[in-house]
Amino acid sequence: MNKDQLPIENNSRHPRVLVFGGLNMGLITKVTRMPEEGETIRGNEFYASSGGKGATQAVAASRNNSEVKMIGKVGDDIFGKSLLDTLNNENIDTDHIGVDSIASTGTGVIIVDSSSQNRVIATYGANLKCDYEQLQSVNQSVEWANILMLQMEIPFELSVQAA
């Protein structure tokens, strides 16, 4: 086997990637400089961007011709709907993403200055509500997958159990 080839044990030509992890909406403001403590400054640009470590991994895998299933949890809000739409548009299976009726979708408030230094406030919201139901989805899908991707934006004990 060539060192650049992945061992793929399914009949597909594409790896099957199972991602169990964070789904967050990034709220990004670009500024000339970081504000001082207690100071309000004017932002130069603002935008929202789908993200979270898990969602970002899923999109990257899908764009590299992998079949991808995403497992996690979002809130029943506009950010959750937007994240699901983004993942579906990237051909990612979202059937196992739970929707929490109480917790909000995870967010990252990101301030980026003109030298690309940033500060981030992460509110994990529904990501921290991942539970046994999502873990069961991982266990049921793991035989399908060649690769299981995990990270730390969901409860740590669930990542450990999934591994």
Question: Which residue ranges define each predicted feature?
Answer:
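Short alpha-helix plus adjacent loop in nuclease-associated cores
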Residues: 105-108
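Glycine-rich phosphate/adenosyl-contacting loop at the front of the ribokinase-like
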Residues: 2-73, 78-82, 88-92
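Short, glycine-/polar-rich solvent-exposed loops and beta-turns at beta-strand/coil boundaries
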Residues: 101-103
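Ribokinase/PfkB-type carbohydrate-kinase core domain
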Residues: 2-23, 73, 84-99, 110-163
